[in-house]
A protein has these predicted regions:
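Conserved NTP-handling cores and scaffolds of large molecular machines
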Residues: 18, 22-25, 69-73, 131, ...
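Non-DNA-binding regulatory cores of transcription-related proteins
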Residues: 75-155
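Internal alpha/beta loop-helix hairpins
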Residues: 46-79, 83
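A generic alpha-helix structural signal
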Residues: 15-18, 66, 127
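N-terminal cationic and glycine-rich segments that engage phosphates or anionic surfaces
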Residues: 1-60
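Glycine-rich, flexible loop/turn motifs
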Residues: 2, 38, 70-71, 81, ...
Length: 156
């Protein structure tokens, strides 16, 4: 499987979440499942059903995080420099109406859709590879938009 970029900070956050899920949340929900099972008839046991559903959600999240970690290409954003937009760059752009937008380009899992955008989003894909002073075209569902790259930085 192709390695997917993720920042060191994002990777470390996933490791912390995985540790919490495995060492705290999953053992706790297993205790609740065991307790609910001890109440008897499982067919009409709402506590048991709810606990099993929560256990499934936790197990699914653990599998997802383990898959992301296994296929991650960790990038130390703080070690990057230059004026070209690459994964990890914080980019200041201006559209044709004079509206400015600053965002950081990171992985899908790290994006929030506003200040941190995915490198696979339409805006992320359009910006990557361009330099300060370049204008690029972003294809959005609402139409095309021209963005001029005003600044690129990597450290806050």
């Amino acid at each position: 499987m192709e390695k997917k970029p993720i920042s060191r900070q994002g990777f470390d956050a996933l490791l912390r979440e995985l540790k919490d899920l495995k060492e705290n949340q999953r053992p706790e929900i297993l205790k609740v499942v065991q307790w609910a099972r001890s109440l008897g008839d499982l067919s009409e046991n709402a506590d048991y059903s709810a606990a099993k559903e929560k256990q499934r959600q936790i197990d699914k999240r653990i599998q997802f995080i383990e898959s992301v970690i296994e296929n991650a290409q960790v990038i130390d954003v703080d070690s990057l420099s230059g004026n070209r937009v690459v994964f990890g760059a914080k980019v200041l752009t201006e559209d044709e109406d004079g509206n400015k937008m600053e965002c950081r380009i990171l992985s899908d899992i790290e994006s929030d859709g506003r200040m941190v955008i995915s490198c696979t989003s339409p805006v992320g894909r359009a910006l990557i590879g361009h330099c300060v002073g370049d204008t690029c075209t972003v294809r959005l569902p609402s139409g095309q938009k021209e963005l001029e790259i005003i600044d690129v930085k990597f450290k806050d």
